[in-house]
Amino acid sequence: MKFYIVAAALFLTFGVSAQSSLKGKIKDEQGQPIYGVNIHISELQKGTTSDENGGFILKNIKEGSFKVTFSMVGFKTEIRKIAFTQNNTVEILQTLKEDSESLSEVVVSASRRSEYLSEIPASITVVNQKQLTDLSNSTTNINEILEFTVPGLAVSTGTFSNWGQTLRGRSLLVMIDGVPQSTPLRNGQLGIKSVSPNDISRVEVIKGATSIFGNGGNGGFINYITKKPNANEKIEGTTNIWGASNLTKTKDAFGFGAYQSLRGKIDKFNYYVSGSYEETGNKYDADGKVILPTYGLDNTRIYTALAKLEYEISDRQKISIGGNLYNSLQDTPFIPVLGSFEVYNENGDYTLIPGHGIEGSIEGQEPTGSKLYNGNLKYDLNSIFDGTTDFKADVYYQKTKNIFFYSDKFENGGQSVINAKKYGLRPNFNTTLTPNESTEISLTYGLDLLKDKTNQGLLDGRLWVPNIDMFSWAQYIQSTVKLNDEWVLKAGLRYDDMNLTIDDYNTLPYSPLGDGNFNPSVAVEGGKLGFDNLAFNAGVRYIKHQEFIPYVSYSQGFSIADLGSVLRSAKADSVEDIQLEPAVTKNYEFGFLSKFKNFRLEAVGYYSVSNLGTGVAFDENINSFVPSKKPQNIYGGEIAIDYTAFDSKLQVGTSYSYVEGLTHNVGDENNLTYLGGDVIAAPKLTAYVTWVPTNKISTSLRMTNLGDRNRFNPYLDANDNYTFRHTQFPVEGYTLLNWSMNYKLQENISVSLAVNNLLNEYYLPARSQWAAPLRTFTGTGEGTNAKLSMLYNF
């Protein structure tokens, strides 16, 4: 802590000498600001980088004429000789031209500082705004967009739930602009579908164990970076309207939506506001049957709003305030008819009959879905401590309300709801040092303070998961050393300290398997629980040759098991008797990136171990969820290839993801068993081809293929019938084709048409299969459906 006290004192008392400054903005040839440009005066060993608005300031420059270098991957380097006089500020506007010989790279900021993608020793997928716009022509469901674009992410469940949509077989943390949306204290696993794709400028997916943002990142994290108030005029905007329908059967299947955004710059103020409304109709499978409505996407109303306001206090200071809401509520006219299955023999031959919906209603059931609210206040101060350091701090508030479907697993039935509130404060420093021309050292360090209040009850007032009140604080430091523009070395530490207070409560009678076997109510005395964890990461990447950019890395992540699931089925008399500790995940990774003029290849292999397993496991002997005590070993690989030809008029690409996992009892490493489908996804293959015959027309064909996964043998239950255990049902693969076309009516007006499941494939999403023993989730996927939309920019 002494380090931070000293840093804070320096921050409050820093001063500068009476010397010159260089201030400016950097733009591309279209006049758009460029983020992350290196500005360096080698003779003075001074440097900085441009901010999100392309602005920069370099202070304490002595009198004289010096060469200033402006460089960034994907742009031609510019060198200007500038004369400085004492006590003077030189202002410039610098334009950089794209380098046709180099592939432009996205700057990644999810790791708390801007970094080049090819210089990070880790596996990262960035879904840029163009990809989001193109794929949004087909769907507004972000789960399906990420399913196609992110190798290593399991396929979508076809619902608004992401239970089973793991990242490399591990749980993931979902964030919006760095603010956590997941509810790890009682993980409802609805976090991925938490924002409108229209409001996203890019998605950053960091894979492998990570603790850079704390609890929950065993498999990595997804960070939605929302659009910023960057504009050249007082008012600019985008209008998007669309209609969609199932084509297999059209009865009440029509849906529609509208989105409007406005942005602008007025003096020192920048603003961005948006709102959208969407309604979906009935959903039918390839045979024209109503899709199972549980967690469904049918008959859903979605409201979204986003607002950001920035004020430039000075050349180096900026304050911004923002917030967003996302309400997605399903009010379906259908009730579920649950699926069923029969296993015939010890070989595992089976018949699986999926569930579906029939007209009807459940008395008292409220609409299901999510209500999310975010608010944040940010302060930026650049070029302090002799121009070497940028300081950022943000205060945020996040509220989640997840409303689940009616279930007869509760005594007398009921509908549960997760309520979570988070309050956070995060001061962060980024320091860049250039001891010589061949060495650049970057340090990121700061504090995370978090208050999280979570519970889960029933809408009728019964409490299922007691009030959990957590306060955590963490300190971290991440270092990067760049040597001779050839090597990037990275290492970091994060220490977390968590303290939880849990109220006294009584467990609810509950039947986890829905078989009428209700656990009795237990009175549990509340108390306090404490956890701490020190996580380490290190990596190295060789960046000299674009044709082969290899890396190797090691990282750790940690999470508290889904504490709410444990508490609601507790057998102990006191929470202090529950043996619970963080699950620590260690991730080993090797990969490389190869880039040629028109060709890009990325491949990675990984091995991940967790000494306690992750999450919770179902114990059939006591009919309850318990903390997982079995170590898990997960391994896999990913490959992605992209190629462009004919002046980028033809674009083709493919990716393949494979993951497998094993577990064993503590002390019995030789008796290995496979992990279930809720953890390990079946292999995934994607491919696309995009053709742009003219400047006005583009068309794409995309394929998603899910492979088979059949790792488990059936067993005889108490009635001498063959069956499969929880999450161990075989998965049978399928292939989906989606087509879309975009046509520019004018430079600022375009229309698009998309057809999903082009061949009307009858299929069951992976979760509908491996979770078949639960019956609740076994539904079919949607048949052929279409979306027609129009986009207008002004």
Where are the predicted features?
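C-terminal beta-signal and adjacent terminal beta-strands/loops
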Residues: 4, 558, 646, 652, ...
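Flexible loop and strand-edge segments within Gram-negative outer membrane beta-barrel domains
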Residues: 280-282, 296-302, 316-378, 382-384, ...
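Gram-negative outer-membrane beta-barrel transporters
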Residues: 240, 450, 485, 598-600, ...
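Structural signature of Gram-negative outer-membrane beta-barrels, strongest in the C-terminal barrel
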Residues: 314, 440-444, 448-450, 463-610, ...
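Transmembrane beta-barrel wall of Gram-negative outer-membrane proteins
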Residues: 251-280, 285, 289-333, 435, ...
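Extracytoplasmic beta-strand/coil segments of soluble accessory domains associated
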Residues: 143-183
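A beta-strand signature from Gram-negative outer-membrane beta-barrel systems
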Residues: 197-238, 793
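Short acidic/polar hinge/loop motifs at secondary-structure boundaries
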Residues: 59, 144, 179-207, 260
